[in-house]
Curated annotation (Swiss-Prot):
Complex formation: Monomer or homodimer. Interacts with CAV1; the interaction forms a stable heterooligomeric complex that is required for targeting to lipid rafts and for caveolae formation. Tyrosine phosphorylated forms do not form heterooligomers with the Tyr-19-phosphorylated form existing as a monomer or dimer, and the Tyr-27-form as a monomer only. Interacts (tyrosine phosphorylated form) with the SH2 domain-containing proteins, RASA1, NCK1 and SRC. Interacts (tyrosine phosphorylated form) with INSR, the interaction (Tyr-27-phosphorylated form) is increased on insulin stimulation.
UniProt topological domain (Cytoplasmic) ranges: 1-86, 108-162
Sorted UniProt keywords: Cell membrane, Cytoplasm, Golgi apparatus, Membrane, Nucleus, Phosphoprotein
Metal-binding keyword on record: no
UniProt-annotated location(s): Nucleus; Cytoplasm; Golgi apparatus membrane; Cell membrane
This protein's name: Caveolin-2
Function: May act as a scaffolding protein within caveolar membranes. Interacts directly with G-protein alpha subunits and can functionally regulate their activity. Acts as an accessory protein in conjunction with CAV1 in targeting to lipid rafts and driving caveolae formation. The Ser-36 phosphorylated form has a role in modulating mitosis in endothelial cells. Positive regulator of cellular mitogenesis of the MAPK signaling pathway. Required for the insulin-stimulated nuclear translocation and activation of MAPK1 and STAT3, and the subsequent regulation of cell cycle progression.
InterPro entries named among the record's database cross-references: Caveolin, Caveolin_CS
Entry PTM: Phosphorylated on serine and tyrosine residues. CAV1 promotes phosphorylation on Ser-23 which then targets the complex to the plasma membrane, lipid rafts and caveolae. Phosphorylation on Ser-36 appears to modulate mitosis in endothelial cells. Phosphorylation on both Tyr-19 and Tyr-27 is required for insulin-induced 'Ser-727' phosphorylation of STAT3 and its activation. Phosphorylation on Tyr-19 is required for insulin-induced phosphorylation of MAPK1 and DNA binding of STAT3. Tyrosine phosphorylation is induced by both EGF and insulin (By. similarity).
Organism expressing this protein natively: Saimiri boliviensis boliviensis
GO biological process, one term: regulation of mitotic nuclear division
Phosphoserine: residues bearing it: 20, 23, 36
Membrane topology: Peripheral membrane protein
Cellular component terms (Gene Ontology): acrosomal membrane; caveola; caveolar macromolecular signaling complex; focal adhesion; Golgi membrane; nucleus; perinuclear region of cytoplasm; plasma membrane raft
Length: 162
């Protein structure tokens, strides 16, 4: 419905002074803490989560809302995404990190102390099991399959058109 032909670019700017990066506590040695400017996803594990407003909400050329509605909805989308992410990470990041640590520690322990010794034991015993399996296959399974194959090879089918 808007009459403007140029695409509007909406950006949200926040000054560093308007919000706090931490809880307001003064730490004794700030060099011990992670710099918030560094890349926290160096291996690009979550590159698929970089969604913008246009990736989620898109209006075709034939149906446009008013420009002010588009700008306000874009701003509300960005603000709500920012605020909700911060809110959820405050309450979920520490418990989920704790649970993930327990899970990975348990899986590592199982892999190191149970799975790998079992696999190594199987690989040590495997040559003798392979010899026994080959003998069973040659003595029982191969003659059975051969006789079944010979029985079915003598079967012939004829189709008649009635």
């Amino acid at each position: 419905m808007g009459l403007e032909t140029e695409k509007a670019d909406v950006q949200l700017f926040m000054d560093d002074d308007s919000y706090s990066h931490h809880s307001g506590l003064e730490y004794a040695d700030p060099e011990k803490f992670v710099d918030s400017g560094q890349d926290r996803d160096p291996h690009r594990l979550n590159s698929h989560l970089k969604l913008g407003f246009e990736d989620v909400i898109a209006e075709p050329v034939t149906t446009h809302s008013f420009d002010k509605v588009w700008i306000c909805s874009h701003a509300l989308f960005e603000i709500s995404k920012y605020v909700m992410y911060k809110f959820l990470t405050v309450f979920l990041s520490i418990p989920l990190a704790f649970l993930a640590g327990i899970l990975f520690a348990t899986l590592s322990c199982l892999h190191i102390w149970i799975i790998m010794p079992f696999v190594k034991t199987c690989l040590m015993v495997l040559p003798s099991v392979q010899t026994i399996w080959k003998s069973v296959t040659d003595a029982i399974i191969a003659p059975l399959c051969t006789s079944i194959g010979r029985s079915f090879s003598s079967v012939s089918l004829q189709l008649s058109h009635d």
